[in-house]
């Protein structure tokens, strides 16, 4: 442990220069009031780091610099020198000083001072470094104890007293650790709170997505079921239509067989009727021979009518059926006419072009024939041979032309076929490109990753929730602070009014003469006494009574100044005033009285500049201030030369006169107005207003966050909704594209089948072309041989030219023939085929129309004829019956035959009717078959387009009607679910996974929370353990210390179970008295107990040195001796520097320093006892 060896002061307060050795043991410093002895204590505190000038009894730090002879020094410095035991200061020196220097600007600096090789070295230190150094040395200013500190210990609450033990026990370390744990706990709880918000948001999303996911799953399931049902329905329909077509085919086959049976039977009946008719004719011949002509004629006419009626009926039925066919044929022929007319227009355009070419060729032929006629005369021989060869050549040429025409036709057909094949291939390519494009569209339909959006939405909700909570908390805090601000404003107004009132009272206390002198600016005038000093509010009444009117006396520098002022008053008749010249005024020093109830000498209760000390000694003289009149009365008996004034203004004069009663203050002395409260209130107001501004700014910031995040949240939610709709649209596009692809693939399949047929046909045409080309080549060879023979006969020039002309003519004729042939073909096609075809078609249409008209007329005619003939038949039969009676037997035979014939004919007609019915039924079945074949083709197309799916047994059991009803129900149910968010399944799975992550994270945070709670509990237990250990030691020390001074002392906890929820109580029994609490003790007993408490703490953790400043002021003689012995004993372990006026204390010191004032500066003289 280091030792304080020396204190050095330069220009510090009342000391110009001082070097004070501090030996080990007990050092006392004595001196009269105002001598400056307490300035030594201030010097020590100054170095130990006091940051407030007021605590060093100065208005500002620059006020610590010595002021002498009207001039302030440039700086002040104080240095404390310590032994450097165990290299405590980390420098190579036996003695190290800690120096603090202050400049006139108020700025202070720290230095570490030591000697190295007899040279002084200084190292500048920061305040922080110095404080750390003092902390290591155990010197933090709490080893300096003043009478005020004793009062503080006496007056502090038990809680604050416990806090002293808290500090010395070092449990702040646990508090710091606990605070850190609390911060971590707070963080963990904030994280739990934050994650709860996230979980809540994710739960909400999960609930919303769950419904959408279930809908999507249901939608998928229903769509799959719908696909299966549709697939099953198509399969059922295909199967049903195949069975139906098979049944229809079987029905047609059976009907054809039945029709053939009926027709065979008709032929048999016809044979039988023919036989019966032969027999009937024989009978008729016999009747003719035997009967009259009329009967026979009637019979004949009847039979003819019957036959005619029957034939008319057949014709009528046939005409009706024919009419239907004619109507259909008319429509077909009209379509064919339109197509043929289109071909005629195309051929006519071609013919016109070729006719123009023929005209040009004919002009060339005409010119060549003219030349040929001239050459003919010269040519006589070889004509017959040439003619024969030419005829042969012409026949071959015609054959070649014929084959070439056929070849041209085939090549044209081949070209048309190739064009058709190319168109088909182009169509396939176009379809393939479309399929590729559609597939690319399907590939480009990418899913949008919504995970970041949901995560951002979650973060935004957390931000919004926390911001809202923050706003709510801030609003509450703002409300509380506003209420507190209102209270502080009211308190400020009240305190300010009080201070203002005090100042106004001070101004009103002056009479006119004093005010005039003070305002006259006369030389040497200083001020009135009351303005040169100030006291505390609690001493105001006592001081004003003690000083009386002397407080209004005017202080001047010299007597001449007083004379000048008096003349000034006389000349102006301003009244009277009392003047106190500093060069002549003398006062009396008051006695020191150490008794219970004594507050102090009146002069000591007033603060003033030392240069005015004689003025205040004159004003107060031997006046002592005591607590009350009873104490004054007792002390007046003992101290007869002392004037006693009580705190409430009662007076006992040395003469025995007593003055008392109600006193009305006139504010003659300045009160040491405590502006700290007002300043504190103002500081609090400023702090709260600043905090309110920050809160408002924070609320605005959080509100902006809420607004911005809410807008962003809405934007994300809208984005998710758009994504949802886009997903549906993409799915619809994908479904449409898939169907379209299959349709195009099916179309390509049909085209490929068609191309296969066209390619086969092309092969056939190519084969035929090859055959014709081979034949043409053969004919050309034969023709070339004939031409070579002709060349032999055409060797002369005329013949050669004739041959050339013939050749040219042949070529031209050939071209002309070819063109004519083409024209003829075109004309033939138009005239003989197309126009006749149109004419034929028109004729056919006309015929069909005429036929239709005729048929309609025939139908009308035959209906009328049948009705007319039936009427005539009826009449003839009546006549015949009358005539037939005579030829009964023959007639009966005849009638029998006729009946048989009629029966057979009726049977024949019935059979033929059945045949017609069968044919009609066959036609109906054929139509029905075509319809069902078309339906089957459509269903098979659908089956191809459909994706193959597994069909459940339940669907297989349903028939077509049940499936159609079921499909309708499924479609309605699917429609009711739309629109469906198909991403909901993926989003739900992501959010569910996120939910699990958050739950796990929450458990982790809960574990952290539990860990920090456990740590806090452990720290609290350890803190209590350490505190109790220190408290028990201090309590034991307190008992021992109190025992040493002849009494019984006890420290106890208000709350033994939880000491930090209560304070420390002090109970003591001073010598010869019962056990009392601190509140029940007298002032001296309280001081003694406070000192005992301080010594108990000192014994626990001794500091290198202690400074005690007039801590014995309130003690009686006996207790001062006890405390002095205690200090003497404690000084064996630590240095003690004691400021005291008490003889009992000073007499026990090892070294005594006396402080005195000389020419306004403090001096020190030392005595070793």
UniProtKB/Swiss-Prot annotation:
<feature type="coiled-coil region">
    <location>
        <begin position="166"/>
        <end position="507"/>
    </location>
</feature>
<dbReference type="GO" id="GO:0006260">
    <property type="term" value="P:DNA replication"/>
</dbReference>
<protein>
    <recommendedName>
        <fullName>Chromosome partition protein Smc</fullName>
    </recommendedName>
</protein>
<keyword id="KW-0067">ATP-binding</keyword>
<dbReference type="GO" id="GO:0016887">
    <property type="term" value="F:ATP hydrolysis activity"/>
</dbReference>
<dbReference type="GO" id="GO:0007059">
    <property type="term" value="P:chromosome segregation"/>
</dbReference>
<dbReference type="InterPro" id="IPR024704">
    <property type="entry name" value="SMC"/>
</dbReference>
<dbReference type="GO" id="GO:0005737">
    <property type="term" value="C:cytoplasm"/>
</dbReference>
<dbReference type="GO" id="GO:0007062">
    <property type="term" value="P:sister chromatid cohesion"/>
</dbReference>
<dbReference type="Pfam" id="PF06470">
    <property type="entry name" value="SMC_hinge"/>
</dbReference>
<keyword id="KW-0238">DNA-binding</keyword>
<comment type="function">
    <text>Required for chromosome condensation and partitioning.</text>
</comment>
<keyword id="KW-0547">Nucleotide-binding</keyword>
<dbReference type="InterPro" id="IPR036277">
    <property type="entry name" value="SMC_hinge_sf"/>
</dbReference>
<dbReference type="GO" id="GO:0005524">
    <property type="term" value="F:ATP binding"/>
</dbReference>
<dbReference type="GO" id="GO:0005694">
    <property type="term" value="C:chromosome"/>
</dbReference>
<dbReference type="Pfam" id="PF02463">
    <property type="entry name" value="SMC_N"/>
</dbReference>
<dbReference type="GO" id="GO:0030261">
    <property type="term" value="P:chromosome condensation"/>
</dbReference>
<feature type="coiled-coil region">
    <location>
        <begin position="676"/>
        <end position="1030"/>
    </location>
</feature>
<comment type="similarity">
    <text>Belongs to the SMC family.</text>
</comment>
<dbReference type="InterPro" id="IPR003395">
    <property type="entry name" value="RecF/RecN/SMC_N"/>
</dbReference>
<dbReference type="InterPro" id="IPR011890">
    <property type="entry name" value="SMC_prok"/>
</dbReference>
<dbReference type="GO" id="GO:0003677">
    <property type="term" value="F:DNA binding"/>
</dbReference>
<dbReference type="InterPro" id="IPR010935">
    <property type="entry name" value="SMC_hinge"/>
</dbReference>
<feature type="domain" description="SMC hinge">
    <location>
        <begin position="523"/>
        <end position="636"/>
    </location>
</feature>
<keyword id="KW-0963">Cytoplasm</keyword>
<dbReference type="InterPro" id="IPR027417">
    <property type="entry name" value="P-loop_NTPase"/>
</dbReference>
<feature type="binding site">
    <location>
        <begin position="32"/>
        <end position="39"/>
    </location>
    <ligand>
        <name>ATP</name>
    </ligand>
</feature>
<keyword id="KW-0175">Coiled coil</keyword>
<comment type="subunit">
    <text>Homodimer.</text>
</comment>
């Amino acid at each position: 442990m280091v030792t304080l060896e020396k204190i050095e002061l330069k220009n510090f307060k009342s000391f110009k220069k001082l070097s004070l050795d501090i030996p080990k043991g007990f050092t006392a410093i004595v001196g009269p009031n105002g001598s400056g002895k307490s300035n030594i204590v201030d010097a020590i505190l100054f170095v130990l780091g006091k940051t407030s000038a007021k605590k060093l009894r100065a208005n500002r730090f620059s006020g610590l610099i010595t002021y002498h002879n009207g001039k302030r020094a440039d700086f002040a410095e104080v240095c404390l020198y310590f032994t450097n035991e165990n290299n405590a200061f980390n420098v190579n020196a036996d003695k190290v000083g800690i120096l603090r220097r202050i400049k006139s600007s108020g700025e202070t600096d720290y230095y570490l001072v030591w000697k190295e090789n007899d040279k002084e070295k200084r190292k500048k230190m920061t305040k922080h470094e110095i404080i750390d150094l003092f902390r290591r040395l155990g010197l933090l200013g709490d080893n300096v104890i003043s009478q005020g500190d004793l009062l503080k210990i006496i007056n502090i609450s038990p809680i604050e007293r416990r806090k002293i033990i808290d500090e010395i026990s070092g449990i702040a370390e646990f508090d710091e650790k606990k605070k850190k744990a609390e911060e971590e706990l707070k963080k963990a709880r904030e994280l739990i709170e934050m994650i709860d918000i996230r979980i809540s948001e994710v739960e909400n999303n999960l609930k919303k997505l769950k419904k959408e996911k279930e809908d999507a799953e249901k939608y998928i399931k229903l769509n799959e079921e719908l696909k299966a049902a549709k697939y099953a329905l198509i399969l059922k329909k295909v199967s049903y239509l195949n069975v139906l077509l098979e049944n229809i085919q079987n029905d047609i086959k059976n009907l054809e067989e039945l029709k053939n049976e009926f027709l065979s039977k008709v032929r048999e009946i016809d044979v039988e009727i023919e036989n019966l008719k032969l027999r009937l004719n024989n009978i008729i011949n016999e009747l003719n021979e035997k009967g009259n002509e009329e009967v026979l004629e009637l019979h004949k006419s009847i039979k003819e009518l019957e036959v005619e009626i029957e034939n008319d009926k057949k014709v009528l039925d046939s005409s009706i059926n024919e009419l239907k066919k004619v109507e259909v044929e008319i429509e077909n022929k009209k379509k064919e006419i339109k197509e043929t007319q289109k071909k005629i227009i195309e051929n006519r355009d071609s013919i016109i072009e070729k006719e123009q070419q023929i005209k040009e060729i004919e002009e060339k032929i005409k010119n060549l024939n003219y030349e040929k006629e001239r050459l003919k005369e010269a040519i006589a021989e070889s004509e017959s041979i040439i003619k024969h060869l030419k005829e042969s050549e012409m026949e071959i040429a015609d054959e070649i032309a014929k084959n070439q025409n056929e070849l041209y036709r085939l090549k044209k057909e081949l070209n048309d076929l190739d064009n058709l094949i190319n168109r088909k291939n182009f169509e396939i390519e176009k379809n393939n490109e479309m399929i590729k494009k559609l597939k690319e569209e399907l590939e480009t339909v990418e899913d949008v990753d919504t995970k970041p959006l949901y995560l951002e939405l979650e973060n935004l909700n957390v931000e919004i929730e926390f911001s809202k909570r923050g706003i709510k908390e801030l609003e509450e805090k703002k409300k509380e602070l506003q209420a507190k601000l209102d209270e502080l404003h009211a308190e400020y107004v009240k305190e300010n009014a009080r201070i203002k009132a005090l100042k106004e009272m001070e101004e009103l206390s002056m009479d006119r003469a004093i005010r005039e002198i003070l305002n006259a600016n006369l030389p040497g005038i200083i001020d009135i006494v009351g303005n040169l000093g100030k006291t505390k509010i609690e001493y105001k009444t006592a001081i004003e009574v003690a000083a009386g009117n002397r407080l209004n006396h005017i202080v001047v520098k010299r007597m001449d100044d007083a004379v000048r002022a008096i003349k000034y008053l006389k000349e102006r008749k301003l009244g009277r005033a009392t003047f106190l010249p500093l060069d002549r005024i003398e006062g009396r020093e008051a006695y020191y009285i150490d008794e219970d109830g004594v507050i102090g000498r009146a002069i000591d209760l007033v603060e003033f500049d030392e240069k005015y000390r004689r003025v205040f000694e004159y004003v107060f003289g031997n006046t002592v201030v005591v607590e009350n009149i009873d104490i004054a009365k007792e002390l007046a008996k003992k101290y007869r030369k002392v004037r006693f004034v009580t705190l409430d203004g009662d007076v006992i004069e040395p003469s025995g006169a007593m003055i008392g009663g109600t006193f009305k203050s006139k504010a003659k002395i300045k009160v040491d107005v405590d502006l700290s409260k007002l300043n504190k209130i103002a500081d609090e107001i400023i702090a709260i207003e600043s905090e309110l501004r920050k809160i408002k700014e924070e609320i605005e910031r959080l509100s902006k966050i809420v607004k911005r995040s809410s807008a962003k949240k809405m934007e994300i939610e809208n984005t998710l909704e758009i994504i949802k709709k886009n997903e549906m649209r993409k799915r619809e596009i994908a479904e449409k594209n898939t169907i379209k692809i299959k349709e195009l693939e099916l179309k390509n399949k049909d085209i490929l089948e068609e191309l296969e047929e066209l390619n086969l046909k092309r092969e056939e045409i190519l084969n035929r072309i090859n055959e014709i080309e081979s034949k043409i080549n053969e004919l050309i060879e034969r023709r070339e041989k004939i031409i070579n023979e002709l060349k032999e006969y055409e060797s002369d020039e005329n013949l050669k030219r004739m041959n050339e002309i013939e050749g040219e003519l042949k070529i031209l004729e050939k071209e002309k023939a070819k063109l004519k042939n083409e024209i003829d073909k075109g004309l033939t096609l138009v005239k003989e085929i197309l126009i006749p075809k149109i004419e034929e078609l028109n004729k056919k249409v006309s015929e069909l129309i005429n036929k239709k008209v005729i048929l309609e007329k025939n139908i009308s005619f035959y209906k009328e004829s049948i009705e007319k003939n039936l009427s005539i038949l009826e009449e003839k039969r009546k006549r015949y019956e009358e005539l037939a009676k005579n030829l009964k037997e023959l007639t009966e035979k005849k009638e029998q035959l006729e009946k048989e014939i009629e029966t057979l004919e009726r049977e024949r007609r019935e059979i033929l009717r059945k045949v017609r019915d069968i044919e009609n039924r066959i036609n109906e079945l054929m139509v029905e078959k075509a319809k069902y074949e078309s339906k089957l083709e459509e269903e098979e197309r659908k089956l191809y387009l459909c994706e193959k799916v597994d069909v459940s047994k339940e669907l297989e059991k349903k028939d077509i009607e049940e499936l159609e009803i079921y499909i309708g129900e499924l479609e309605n149910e699917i429609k009711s679910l739309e629109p469906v968010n198909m991403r909901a399944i993926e989003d739900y799975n992501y959010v569910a996974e996120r939910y699990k992550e958050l739950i796990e994270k929450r458990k982790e945070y809960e574990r952290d929370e539990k860990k920090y709670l456990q740590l806090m509990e452990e720290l609290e237990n350890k803190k209590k353990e350490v505190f109790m250990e220190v408290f028990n030691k201090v309590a034991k020390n307190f008992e021992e210390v109190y025992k040493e001074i002849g009494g019984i002392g006890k420290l106890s906890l208000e709350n033994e179970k939880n000491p930090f929820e209560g304070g420390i109580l002090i109970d003591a029994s001073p010598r010869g008295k019962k056990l009392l609490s601190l509140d029940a003790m007298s002032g001296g007993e309280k001081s003694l107990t406070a000192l005992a408490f301080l010594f108990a703490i000192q014994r626990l953790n001794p500091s290198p040195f202690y400074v005690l400043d007039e801590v014995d002021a309130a003690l009686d003689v006996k207790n001062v001796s006890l405390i002095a012995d205690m200090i003497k004993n404690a000084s064996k372990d630590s240095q003690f520097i004691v400021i005291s006026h008490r003889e009992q204390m000073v007499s026990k010191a090892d070294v005594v320093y006396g402080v005195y004032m000389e020419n306004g500066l403090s001096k020190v003289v030392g005595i070793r006892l």
